[in-house]
């Protein structure tokens, strides 16, 4: 399993407060940190991917982080007149995009690594149940719960 990240929450806050560009920048920073953690061995799962597919591992880290921050900002912008709803949808969007791009990369450009890790288990089952399953649900739940706090931060900052 991949580690659960709480880093998406500050990315969403930045995207909501300062727009999609800021969300993308924070997401890119998250991607860089994730890639470095994998390269250095701090994150064993990412390191395993890096050993088997260095270019695509780094590219996936950078793209998924950047895209989740940008998407959260765009979604918030689309719904911003309804602050609480906008924050909820933006907060849910980030883990969906982050995990979705990871899954897409694993099923396409890093499929060889996925097959190696699955060790004979059906790759779709392995990816979505073993690797992503609980992680995604926890991240989605945390972001949903914290979206009200994000909305409150936006209200307070917006009044200044």
Regions found by a protein language model. Give the residues of each.
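Loop-helix junctions at membrane interfaces
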Residues: 1-160
């Amino acid at each position: 399993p991949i580690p659960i990240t709480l880093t998406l929450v500050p990315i969403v806050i930045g995207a909501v407060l300062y727009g999609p560009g800021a969300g993308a920048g924070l997401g890119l920073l998250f991607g860089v940190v994730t890639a470095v953690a994998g390269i250095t061995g701090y994150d064993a799962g990412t390191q395993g991917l890096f050993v088997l597919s260095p270019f695509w591992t780094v590219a996936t880290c950078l793209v998924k982080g950047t895209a989740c921050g940008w998407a959260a900002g765009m979604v918030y912008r689309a719904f911003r007149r309804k602050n609480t709803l906008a924050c909820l949808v933006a907060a849910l969007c980030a883990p969906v995009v982050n995990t979705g791009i990871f899954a897409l990369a694993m099923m396409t450009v890093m499929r060889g690594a996925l097959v190696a890790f699955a060790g004979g288990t059906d790759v779709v089952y392995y990816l979505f149940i073993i690797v992503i399953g609980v992680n995604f649900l926890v991240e989605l739940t945390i972001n949903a719960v914290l979206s009200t706090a994000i909305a409150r931060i936006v209200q307070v900052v917006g009044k200044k």
